[in-house]
Amino acid sequence: MASREMLIIISVLATTLIGLTVATDHTIGGPSGWTVGASLRTWAAGQTFAVGDNLVFSYPAAFHDVVEVTKPEFDSCQAVKPLITFANGNSLVPLTTPGKRYFICGMPGHCSQGMKLEVNVVPTATVAPTAPLPNTVPSLNAPSPSSVLPIQPLLPLNPVPVLSPSSSTPLPSSSLPLIPPLSPALSPATAAGTSLPLFPGSPGSSSSTTSTKTVGTFPSSTTGTTADLAGADSPPADSSSAAKTLVLGFGFMVAMMLHLF
């Protein structure tokens, strides 16, 4: 793409420069000028005269002039019917058409001494027209199809539910239920001669035997004797203390089960 754009720019510049080419001024005879004794034929052989150029004749007006004549008058050095005559000492002749043109000096004897010039004017060099570029040249700023990404539609975002303090559900507490405090007042019988039953999982349940409350002494079946119960004389246990103990044990059992599960 960059090379094609560069070629286009170069072609346009070349065409413009050719169109703006300045016409060449040919000073007749070179440094010697338009005078007797100058080798005008040799000088003209090394020049190229094209349409648009100019012929410049420099000479002393008191001694020379410039006369344009036809081919027969040029050959005979006789300006019978001159086409145009210049006598100002610095004559400028534009070359507007291709073909041959003939010039001599009209002073007597000067043409025969070599003051004659034949000029062959060639057409201006033409440049072949640049082939038109196809209309399919992409723009430099146009993005390529592969670089255009499809636009994905935005998905609606689900609103995040906001829980109000009134609708919040309390989380289950992992803490163990509080164990009711032990009753500070136990009956004398419980404090002195009774032991509380131990439940599974308690610190004291590691022993293989289960402690039981000693209520009294039963008569031995082997002796067959009848004896009074050992605790007959002891005062009866307080019913409220026993109820508290039962509730305490049941609560402890429930606490241990909740802890295990």
Curated annotation (Swiss-Prot):
Binding residues annotated for Cu cation, in chain numbering: 64, 105, 110, 115
Main localization of the protein described in the UniProt heading: membrane
CDD domains: Phytocyanin (cd04216)
Keyword annotations: Cell membrane, Copper, Disulfide bond, Glycoprotein, GPI-anchor, Lipoprotein, Membrane, Metal-binding, Signal
Subcellular location field: Cell membrane
Organism name: Arabidopsis thaliana
Protein name per the record: Uclacyanin 1
Upper taxonomic lineage: Eukaryota, Viridiplantae, Streptophyta, Embryophyta, Tracheophyta
Stretches for region Disordered: 194-239
Gene3D superfamilies for this protein: Cupredoxins - blue copper proteins
Molecular function in Gene Ontology: electron transfer activity; metal ion binding
Phytocyanin domain sequence ranges: 24-123
PANTHER family: BLUE COPPER PROTEIN, UCLACYANIN 1
Membrane topology value: Lipid-anchor; GPI-anchor
Disulfide-linked positions: 77-111
